[in-house]
A protein has these predicted regions:
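Thiamine diphosphate
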Residues: 1-169
Length: 169
């Protein structure tokens, strides 16, 4: 099953949605794929997952930016970047451990397969901090105020996608 906020700009949607889905489907694998800024909107809810032994998996695509905001600024506002980058991020592995969850980090693409298996095989809540290219864009993208049929599908030429970005596809 797939749940999404559908490009509505609902930063922070994924973590509480994952908790609700895990309660509704306790035997299913539930993975929240989100950026680090989205997770920080309500990170405290990981305590709910730990308290109720909900084995949700939080897979953070960590580029140290509000990724979609940075991407809008790049593609739609002539690279006029404003307030979308932060150096003041927590160590998500330590944060997971502080809550009593499992923390995993992947720094390079060659680590992904093994660490994703570790995440999936855990019977506890997991925060997976996946460090990604800071300038990699995420597609498809629905520009602010546009309908779904006007989504941006990405560079027409694959040469515009970094090797790190291709690894995640």
């Amino acid at each position: 099953r797939w749940m999404t906020s559908g490009g509505l700009g609902t930063m922070g949607y994924g973590l509480p949605a994952a908790i609700g889905v895990q309660v509704a489907h306790p035997k299913k694998l539930v993975v929240d794929i989100a950026g680090e800024a989205s997770i920080l909107m309500n990170m405290q809810e990981i305590s709910t997952a730990v308290q109720y032994r909900l084995p949700i998996k939080i897979f953070i695509l960590n580029n140290e930016y509000m990724g979609m905001v940075r991407q809008w600024q790049e593609l739609l506002h002539d690279k006029n970047y404003s307030e979308s980058y932060t150096e003041a991020l927590p160590d998500f592995v330590k944060l997971a451990e502080a809550y009593g969850a499992v923390g995993i980090r992947a720094k390079t693409p060659d680590e992904l397969d093994e660490k994703i298996k570790e995440m999936i095989n855990s019977d506890q809540p997991v925060i997976f901090d996946c460090l990604v290219d800071k300038q990699e864009n995420c597609y498809p993208m629905i520009p602010s105020g546009k309908p779904h049929n006007q989504m941006l599908l990405g560079p027409e030429d694959e040469k515009d996608v970094s090797d790190e970005g291709k690894t995640l596809v």
